[in-house]
Amino acid sequence: MSTTTITKNPTIVSIFSGCGGLDLGFHQEGYKTIWANDFAEWAVESFRANFGDVIHLKDITKIDPYTDKSIPDCDVVLGGFPCQDFSIIWKQPGLNGTRGGLFRHFAEFVDAKKPKAFIAENVKGLLTANDGKAIDTIIKDFESIAPGYLVKPHLYNFAEYGVPQFRERVLFVGVRLDTGFNFIHPKPTHGPNADRPYFTAGEALVGVEKVPYNNEHINIKEKTRQMLSLIPEGGNFTDIPKDNPLYVKGMISHVYRRIKLDEPAKTIIAAGGGGTWGYHYPEPRPLTNRERARLQSFPDDFVFKGSVTEVRRQIGNAVPPEGVRAVARRLMPLFTGDYTPVDLMPEYEKMKKMTVKERLEYVSSEMI
């Protein structure tokens, strides 16, 4: 647990890795994943195709990071612990759900490996799950890991960091107290209050038709084409006139949602029935998986394995790599030694007394 070791390429142990969006963002900034895990077979195949044979297909509840000697020590533990139980789209069993409780396995990996830092990702719904008790418990669990971690959660909108998609996610960044590295979340780089404008869906999709991988078009019914002809750029099902025979009462607003070319896309989702794919404009059709991958900021040489539906799931579940690169850059001095250590204990004690709301506001106020 040396605090002075200088690392050229900080090493990552990645769990709940999916196809590797979070890892890719860190790799693009000079980090290297040396061990990874997921239980979804095709996501593991995609990860392996892009990062090499460092990922292990196994149920994380069957892995003991304290005794499994095949899991190496690392500089960073990262992962997006399963989010379905915390999503604002569905009901929120949160900590009472079998998936929500999996975050504790993430905490066990941090406890076993004692990395200098960890990054955990989850959906915005985590902020309100179990009436706010879920995130409070998660923070306390992370803070209690010896020798102590300063935990700073922040709600990111990845469109503000160069992703051509409005996508809100909570990132927890924890830094080991004995490093003396006071991590501060990076301020937005894109948008009306930043130095650069949003990267738009139209800009992101330029030339996408030339990409040979994961770019199959999906056949749709003539009725769907007729519905799309009634929906304007950036619109959705609610734009269909209520007196039109194609209108169905009770549809939720993100059904048959078409992109707006001069702004980032709405959130790309992983699954769902008819009308949830996300739809092109001006062409009356669903987005291809490669178009969805572009909107998630994946490069064209990132190849996804599996069926069209399976690839859709991987892309929709992924963390957009471009969205976390600023976090990876901000953490890098911790591993190069290019910082002046400070005593983190006063900050740690101060934040422990804060409510979750106060902590989030405090973390946002210090962004630079």
Where does each model-flagged region fall?
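The conserved SAM/SAH-binding core of class I Rossmann-like methyltransferase domains
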Residues: A36-N37
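S-adenosyl-L-methionine
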Residues: E45-D68
